[in-house]
Amino acid sequence: MSDESKPIEEPPIESKPQEEQDTEKESLTNSEESKKRAVEPSTDKKKKRRRRNYDEEDKELEKEEAKEKNAKTENNEEGDDDEDDEDDDYEQGKLEDEEEEEDELLEIDESNIITTGRRTRGKVIDFTKAAEELDKERGVVAEEDEEEEEEEEKENEDDDFKEQVQN
């Protein structure tokens, strides 16, 4: 019972199954048809595509819009009233927005608002003390600069005196 004694049967490579041949023919005919479609102008009117809405609210809105369109086609005079209604609705919405903004501002605690000075992370800074400290630091730096300048002047005077003596 060795593996070598059994011959392995392989299907012939040249023959293709019937299904593959059929799919190739279909793909050729499909590509030919697509070329024909591209060349021939379409006589059918393209439909306007609209996104589908599944919500009940959207259905209600569509019904209302349809009613409005029907009403506009029936009477042009009523269209003027519709415009007035739309203006009123717009103004009403504007007023509601302002009321909401005022309500939001009322919720803010006024004690947390910093009215003067710089914003710090909760730390209260006395700016007069800070200014004095800065002046002191600047004064110390200025004093050091003055001392260095005085030392340089003394060295320059010494150098000048030495030059005079040597001449």
Swiss-Prot record:
Residue stretches of biased makeup (Acidic residues): 76-110, 142-161
Any one Gene Ontology BP term: chromatin remodeling
Protein location: Nucleus
Function: Forms a chaperone-bound H2A.Z-H2B complex that acts as a source for SWR1 complex-dependent H2A to H2A.Z histone replacement in chromatin.
Disulfide bond sites: none
Family as reported in the entry's similarity comment: Belongs to the CHZ1 family.
Chief location category: nucleus
Organism: Candida albicans (strain SC5314 / ATCC MYA-2876)
Subunit organization: Forms a heterotrimer with H2A.Z-H2B, stabilizing the association of the histone dimer. Also, with a lower affinity, forms a heterotrimer with H2A-H2B.
GO molecular function, one term: histone binding
UniProt feature, compositional bias: Basic and acidic residues: 16-44, 60-75, 131-141
Keyword entries, A-Z: Chaperone, Nucleus
Domain of life: Eukaryota
Residue ranges, annotated region (Disordered): 1-116, 131-167
The protein's name: Histone H2A.Z-specific chaperone CHZ1
A GO term from the CC aspect: nucleus
